[in-house]
Structures are given as structure tokens and as C-alpha cells.
Amino acid sequence: MLFKEKTIWITGATSGIGKAVAIELSKENCHLILSGRNETALKETEEACLKNGSRVTLAPFDLGDERSIEMAFNSVKKENFKINALYNFGGISQRSLVNETPLFVDRKIFEVNYFGTITLTKLVLPEIIKNGGGHIAATSSLVGKFGFPYRSSYSASKHALHGFFESLLAENKVNNIRVTMVIPGFINTNISVNAVNSKGTRHGKLDQNQAKGMPADVCARIICKGLKKEKKEILVGKKDKIMVHIKRFVPSLYYHLASRVKPM
């Protein structure tokens, strides 16, 4: 999809990949609707995008709060914007063992990563269809392709997104809806710092693999190239991407490697 003069809604725009993608897209002379929970951080992203010459509308909300999402959507709808694309980058990660994680933590992860994402998507989809079709992207993860230690519900929530958006695409191809799954590996962001632990509180530590990961701005450039081409999947990362192929072609080796992952 050509981005020039298009209206694109981006969630998770306060930090990490979402923020980097918003800044990268702002170079394309488009109209960005930016969402996230932290309004101060959202305004910082807005300032960076405005410097690149794009128009910006802020629509803050909490992905874990359905009512908050609905209010933000209604506020945007009143402006009668012609929405051409929705790019879902908001979410939270996890750092806890299965047998030490209470259900309320599992539910919290799903409320943000799965239900929050599909809530906004279901609200925006009819608007995109009404405007003649458009592009929707959702952010998965390498562990949306396979299970991984200390990320059980995070991995499950990302698997769920694949099922939902593949179904959405099958149902709405006739409506000129295109869908992209963004699948990042280790990217140098604060996702591990902000991950939830077994108590449902902030993990507060930067993983070594995250610290050595691909810079967010480099990741964003790769993602935006893929979004422009409307690829079905955008796999982005360093050598960690090979795990997808190991899991598919040599599963016994994958399980051996995964079992050796150390506690965070």
C-alpha cells in the first residue's frame, strides 16, 4: 500500500517497534492516528512525527480496557476520517514459569495482546470496508510460531492472533482487505523490561538477547518496506529467525535448544 496521504491508525505508538514504525511512516506524508496508554510518551512520538511533515491525531487508550478502546474509537469516528489502514503494535510480554503463573496473569496477557487487539480491529474493520478496503497488520512474535520457556501465555496470545487474522483475511478478501502478520525476533526495545512476571507486576529487567537485538529503527524500516508490499508475513530479526525453520524441519533439535533456556 502506498502510504502518501493515507490515514493509518497505529497502536503501541508510545515506545518500541510501534513508535519506531510511526516515525518511519511519518516520512511518507500521511495522516497518522497514534494510540497508546502513556499520553506523555504518545505526545513525544507525535512531536517526532510532526517534524517529518505528517499530520497526526492522538487517540490514547489502554489495550487492556475495552471501554477505553471504544471511547477512543468513537472519538476518532466523529472526525469522519477515511481510515485506510490499522497497524496493531501494542502488547505486553511475559517472564514466568507455567506452574508459577496464576490465571489472573494469563488473563491479563490475553486481555491486552488478544482481546484488546481484536476489539479495536472489529471496530475499525467496517470503517475500512466502507472506504473501499485497506490494510490491517497485527504484531505476533517468533514465539507466535512456536512455544517458548517463560512465555507460555504470551506465546499462546500470539498464536491466537494468527488464527484470528488468518480467518479475518479469508472472510474479507472479497471486501478488499489485506492482512499482514509482523513477526519480530529479538529487537532492542524495553519489551522485556515491561513484561509481566508471575505476580502480574513489571519484570523490570532487560534481557541479554533483547539488549543485543536489532535496533528498533532498523526493524521499523524493514517492517515498513514489508507493509508497503502488503506481505502476508514480515519476519524480522537477526540469527534468531532461524528458530522458525529449526522448529519446522528439525523439531527435536528445537525442543532440545528450548529446554536449555535459563531463567530470566
Where are these regions (language model features)?
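Conserved glycine-rich cofactor-binding loop
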Residues: T7, T14-S15
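Conserved glycine-rich Rossmann-like NAD(P)H-binding loop of the short-chain dehydrogenase/reductase
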Residues: C30-E44
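The beta1-alpha1 cofactor-binding region of Rossmann-like NAD(H)/NADP(H)-dependent oxidoreductases
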Residues: P60-M71, L103
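Substrate-binding pocket helix/loop in short-chain dehydrogenase/reductase
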Residues: L97-V98, P102-F110
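Active-site helix of classical SDR
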Residues: T121, S157
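Residue(s) in the substrate-gating loop at a strand-loop-helix junction
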Residues: S141
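SDR active-site lid
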Residues: V174-K238
